[in-house]
Amino acid sequence: MSLHYLEDASGLPGGHAERVFVPESDTEIAGILRQAGANATPVTIAGAGTGVTGARVPFGGWVISLEKFNRLEVHPGNAVVGAGVLLRDLHSAATRGNQFYPPDPTETGSSIGGNIACNASGSRSFRYGPTARWVERLRVVLADGRILDLGRGEPIDFDPGTIPLPNVTKNTAGYLLRSGMDWIDLFAGSEGTLGVITEATVRLLPAPVSVLGGVVFFRSDDDALDAVEAWRDAGPRILEYLDAPSLALLRQRHPDIPGEARAALLIEHELESEEDPALDAWIERIEAAGALAEASWFATTASDRERFRKFRHNLPELVNDTVRRAGAMKMNTDYAVPLARNREMLAWYRQRLEAEFPGRYVIFGHIGDAHVHINLFSDPADPERAMNLLKELARKAVEFGGTVSAEHGVGKRKTHLLEVQYAPEHLAAMRAVKRRLDPANILGRGTVFPS
């Protein structure tokens, strides 16, 4: 059995399974699930393995890989996509038809089924929202073998109840239950625990004429955060943040980063023409913000914008290199807070991180959504210290009205955080939905809820 089916990008160790199935049809999956249900055999669904919370890692039982569900048909305004299709292939196919698929999770090698299962986001979610917003139809195989073909707006046939949800733009912490919700919003973000998503129809948009891209450098963090507040309503589709430690790491590969830069914002803005007045408006905004305008980087070509995106995506690689060389252990967060608490939360993060792990962290990410990631370089001999701090930060995020999981899902690694977010009765409501759709608890055992 290939180790590929026993692990994902989370690094969660100990994955093992008795059998791996690679079906080609919904009816094959239905038969496998009926057999598993009869034997109470746990089943883990395998996408591309890019998830970072361990949902795909099996601990016994069977694995169903969706790699052969690779149908991809692009039509005006939508695409029909098998669960095993990779995100980059959907993007490429849409581009060939002068269209684009707005969701853009960082890992373009992720599968569409996995993106829907964890309701993935990305940098463009600032303007376009998470994956679920773009799903118009789903095919799902339930644990009892029933095959559902579900359209957007089709209400579920039972009342799941309603749980209080945070006032944030992104949230993937458990099942986001509300009375009258539709099936698509129930399955999107359920992380393979309620059914097997095999195919989707997703909306596409006409490709913009051009896109302005920029990496804007600032002399201080305060200047960058002032710019975030000023630019949020200016219509960018991307508004990303890098702190001073992030820039220090990135200088290893990009020595042309200005020496006086202590923060950076990555922006993209769609243009209606090559002479769009938005170009001049952005020049004025950047100068008014006191940015290092002459030293910042700008582009309107796709190749240069891709270079900027790779610049941002170099950071996780450099973090991993740093952790490996130092013999440390990386821990990270996926918390988000309401927009009004963005600056306050960031200051509180820094205060606690400097007190406990001075100089051993970076903060970067989706500042436009008040959703930044902390990567913490902790001592592998004392993981509890780092875990306790991250849980403290999670409690603070919830206290501020936020979420403990904005885009990565809960998986198996972060099940302990749901009790920080929700009261026992709200977790009980989620478990009731799980029992309704998967009474034998065969799907994704240990994901979302501890085993």
Model-found features: residue ranges?
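Activity-critical C-terminal alpha-helical subdomain
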Residues: 415-451
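Conserved PLP-binding active-site segment of the aspartate aminotransferase-like
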Residues: 375-381, 413, 417-421
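N-terminal flexible segment immediately upstream of the FAD-binding catalytic core
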Residues: 1-41, 45-78, 128, 201-204, ...
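Short acidic/histidine-rich active-site segments
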Residues: 403-410, 445-448
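C-terminal substrate-recognition/cap domain of FAD-linked oxidoreductases
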Residues: 188-190, 196, 201-392, 400
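FAD-binding subdomain of flavoenzyme oxidoreductases
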Residues: 71-75, 83, 87-88, 92-235
